[in-house]
C-alpha cells in the first residue's frame, strides 16, 4: 500500500492538490486528507505533478532498422528506458525487416515487458505483404492471441509492398472481422512514407466499402505537409492519425525547432477532433535519410524518451496547457 500526499494531480484533467492511495498496484482513492493503514508507505509528493502513465503506440520493442545491412539493426528496448520516459503502456511492432525479425520474437518481448510490470501489446505484420504472422493467419493472430491488437503495413513508401487497393480492402476486412470476434479494436497501423499516393489508397478503400474509417490508422503523418493534410481529412472523417515525435537531446529538438505545436494548431483551425490525433516515439526504430537515387545516406536509433520530451516541449515552447499535452 502506497499513499502519495499533496500531489498536483492530473487525470489527465487537472484535479489540483490531492492525496492518492494505491493498493495492490491499483489506484483505490483520490481525495483530500486520505489515511493509509498499518505498513502503508507514505510519499510526500508536495510540489510534484502526478499524471497517468503515458501510452506510446509505436515502439520497436525488439529493435528495428536494418536498411543499411545487418550492422544497422537496432537493439531491443530496455524496461528502464520506457519507465524513465514516463511510459507505462506500449504497442510493439515490426518495421522494414520481417526476415531477421519475427512476430514470435516480438510477442516474446511484449510478454516479457508485461511480466516486468507494464502494459504491452503487439501487432502482427511489418512493412511487407503478405503479412508475417504467428499462426499463419492475420485473422487468427488478432482473434486468438491476447496481446495482438491489429496489423502493421507500409503504404506510399519506397520500402512498401505496393499492394493494390483490393488487397488493402481484403486486409481491412480481415482485421475488422477478427477484432470483432476477439473483442479488440482491430486496426491497421499504416507506416506512411513520402510517396506521391499519400493516403489515396485508403480513401479509395473507404469509398468502395463499408469498412469503418477507424480501421486504417496511419502513422508518421508529419513526414510532409501534403501527407499531413490528407491525415487531417481522414481525422475529420472519423479516423485516427499518429504523428511521430521529433528527436530531442537533453530536452532540445535536434532540428532546432519543434514543429508539433504548429501542426496541432493547424488541426484545430481545420476543426479536426483533437482526440483523433496522437503522437508516438517510434522508439528503438531507425531514423534514416535517402538521396534522390534512393541510396541510404544516414541512419540512427530513435529514442523512446522523445515522447516525454515532446510533451514537455508542447508546454514550454508551444504554450499548451499541461493537461492538454497529456492527452496526445
Tell what function each PLM region has:
Residues 82, 110-113, 231-234, 267, ...:
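Generic structural signal for hydrophobic
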Residues 96-108, 116-212, 225:
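Buried, small/hydrophobic-residue-enriched core segments of structured protein domains
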Residues 269-328:
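His/Asp/Glu-enriched, well-ordered alpha-helical/loop segment
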Amino acid at each position: 500500500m502506497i499513499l502519495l500526499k499533496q500531489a498536483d494531480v492530473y487525470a489527465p484533467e487537472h484535479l489540483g492538490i490531492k492525496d492518492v492511495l494505491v493498493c495492490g498496484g491499483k489506484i483505490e482513492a483520490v481525495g483530500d486528507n486520505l489515511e493509509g493503514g498499518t505498513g502503508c508507505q507514505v510519499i510526500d509528493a508536495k510540489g510534484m505533478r502526478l499524471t497517468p502513465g503515458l501510452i506510446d503506440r509505436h515502439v520497436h520493442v525488439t529493435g528495428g532498422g536494418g536498411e543499411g545491412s545487418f550492422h544497422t539493426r537496432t537493439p531491443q528496448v530496455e524496461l528502464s528506458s520506457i519507465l524513465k520516459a514516463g511510459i507505462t503502456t506500449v504497442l510493439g511492432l515490426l518495421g522494414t525487416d520481417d526476415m531477421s525479425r519475427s512476430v514470435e520474437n516480438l510477442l516474446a518481448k511484449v510478454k516479457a515487458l508485461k511480466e516486468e510490470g507494464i502494459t504491452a501489446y503487439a501487432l502482427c505484420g511489418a512493412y511487407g505483404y503478405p503479412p508475417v504472422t504467428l499462426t499463419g493467419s492475420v485473422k487468427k493472430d488478432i482473434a486468438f492471441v491476447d496481446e495482438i491488437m491489429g496489423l502493421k503495413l507500409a503504404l506510399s513508401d519506397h520500402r512498401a509492398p505496393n499492394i493494390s487497393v483490393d488487397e488493402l480492402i481484403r486486409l481491412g476486412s480481415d482485421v475488422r472481422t477478427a477484432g470483432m470476434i476477439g473483442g479488440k479494436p482491430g486496426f491497421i497501423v499504416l507506416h506512411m512514407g513520402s510517396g506521391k499516393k499519400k493516403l489515396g489508397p485508403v480513401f479509395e478503400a473507404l469509398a468502395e466499402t463499408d469498412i469503418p474509417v477507424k480501421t486504417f490508422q496511419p502513422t508518421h503523418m508529419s513526414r510532409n505537409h501534403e501527407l499531413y493534410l490528407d491525415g487531417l481529412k481522414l481525422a475529420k472523417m472519423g479516423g485516427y492519425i499518429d504523428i511521430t515525435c521529433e528527436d530531442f537531446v537533453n530536452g532540445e529538438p535536434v532540428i532546432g525547432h519543434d514543429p508539433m505545436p504548429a501542426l496541432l494548431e493547424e488541426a484545430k483551425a481545420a476543426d479536426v477532433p483533437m482526440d483523433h490525433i496522437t503522437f508516438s516515439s517510434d522508439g528503438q526504430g531507425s531514423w534514416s535519410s535517402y538521396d534522390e537515387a534512393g541510396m541510404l545516406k544516414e541512419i540512427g536509433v530513435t529514442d523512446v524518451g522523445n515522447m516525454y520530451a515532446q510533451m514537455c516541449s508542447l508546454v514550454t515552447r508551444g504554450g499548451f496547457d499541461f493537461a492538454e499535452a497529456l492527452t496526445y
